[in-house]
Amino acid sequence: MFISFVIIIILFILNYKQVKHLLYYTIVGVLLWVSMVEAGIHGTLCGAIIALFIPVNIKGQINSSFHKLEKLIQPFVNYFILPLFVFMNSGVLLKDFSFRSVCSSLTFGIILGLFIGKQLRSYAIFLSMREV
C-alpha cells in the first residue's frame, strides 16, 4: 500500500512538471496497477487515479499525444475490455452454462423484454420531446 502511495506521488510530480511523454505515464501506470492489485485494491481504481493525473492541457495547448492514445485504444476498450469487465463482474456462473439454458423461454423473454423496452423507452422520449 505504501508503494502505491509513493507511485501516486510520482504521478503528481509528473503532472506538476507537465511531463507530456506517454512512456512515463505508461510505466508509472503499470507499476501503480501492479502495486494496487498486489495490495488487494481493485484495478479499476488505479485507472481512475491515473486519469486524474494525466495532463490534458499543458501551458494552454491541448496535448495531442494523449488524444492520439485515446483514439488508438478507444475501439479496443469499447468492444472488448468494457464488455468483458461487465460480464466478469455480473456474477454469471459459467459452470452451469449450457446450450439448453441459452435456448430456454426465460432467456428469450429477458432478451425480448430488454429489446422491446429499449425501443419503447426511446419512442416515449421522442414523443415527450416533440412539440405539440
Swiss-Prot record:
InterPro entries: Na/H_antiporter_dom_sf, NhaA
One Pfam family hit: Na_H_antiport_1
GO biological process: regulation of pH
UniProtKB keywords: Cell inner membrane, Cell membrane, Membrane, Transmembrane, Transmembrane helix
GO cellular component: plasma membrane
Membrane topology recorded in Swiss-Prot or TrEMBL: Multi-pass membrane protein
Cellular localisation: Cell inner membrane
Coiled coil region boundaries: none
GO MF annotations, alphabetized: sodium:proton antiporter activity
Membrane-spanning parts: 2-22, 36-56, 72-92, 97-117
UniProt keyword annotation of Cell inner membrane present: yes
Cell membrane found in the keyword field: yes
Main location group: membrane
Similarity comment: Belongs to the NhaA Na(+)/H(+) (TC 2.A.33) antiporter family.
PANTHER family per record: NA(+)_H(+) ANTIPORTER NHAA (PTHR30341:SF0), SODIUM ION/PROTON ANTIPORTER NHAA-RELATED (PTHR30341)
Protein name (record): Putative Na(+)/H(+) antiporter NhaA homolog
Organism: Rickettsia bellii (strain RML369-C)
Phylogenetic lineage: Bacteria, Pseudomonadati, Pseudomonadota, Alphaproteobacteria, Rickettsiales
Gene name per UniProt: nhaA
